[in-house]
Amino acid sequence: MGQQVLKSSNEKMEKAVAAYSRELATVRAGRASSSVLDKVQVDYYGAPTPVVQLANITVPEARLLVIQPYDKTSIGDIEKAILKADLGLNPSNDGTVIRIAFPALTEERRRDLVKVVKKYAEEAKVAVRNVRRDGNDDLKKLEKAGEITEDDLRGYTEDIQKETDKYIAKVDEIAKNKEKEIMEV
């Protein structure tokens, strides 16, 4: 029983770190990345559709994103959706493709982005700690029910703490790398 709680906690912590990584992908670091458009939904024939399903997105240069719609009639809708998504990007449309030039980040904007990264990191750590708390609560319930011994409880609690420390260190490492990427000129 205790092993199941341990396994479940481990999986949930892994998911929390993966969600954090996905969240960080949307924080742009001065370099063009198609992941900034992941959450952009285009109103395509009345249905909200992700832009990645409507167009080929390429990064020909470090600060340029080119969006080539499969259906040329959707180019205006894609452009509107990008503007509406409020990503701080200015798409330019030449009739066949949409180009998005990423401006160089100012020092102030870089610092703001680092703050955002730290905020996301703290949220991810809280999520990992919440999983630890839930796992420990489940273990205490098992001990009260007599399904595991007090010694087992202590051992499993230590195991969950080790996993928690491992995942928090992983979050810190991801955050440190992203901060370094943002502050790179």
Curated annotation (Swiss-Prot):
Instruction: Write one Gene Ontology MF term.
Output: ribosomal large subunit binding
InterPro entries the UniProt entry points to: Ribosome_recyc_fac (IPR002661), Ribosome_recyc_fac_dom (IPR023584), RRF_sf (IPR036191)
A Gene Ontology cellular-component term: cytoplasm
Task: Give the family per the record.
Answer: Belongs to the RRF family.
Q: Which terms under GO biological process does the entry name?
A: translational termination
Question: Which compartment or compartments is the protein found in?
Answer: Cytoplasm
Q: Work out whether the entry's keyword set contains Hydrolase.
A: no
Q: What is its main location?
A: cytoplasm
Function, as annotated, reads: Responsible for the release of ribosomes from messenger RNA at the termination of protein biosynthesis. May increase the efficiency of translation by recycling ribosomes from one round of translation to another.
Alphabetical UniProt keywords? Cytoplasm, Protein biosynthesis
Name by which UniProt lists this protein: Ribosome-recycling factor
Highest taxon listed in the record's lineage: Bacteria
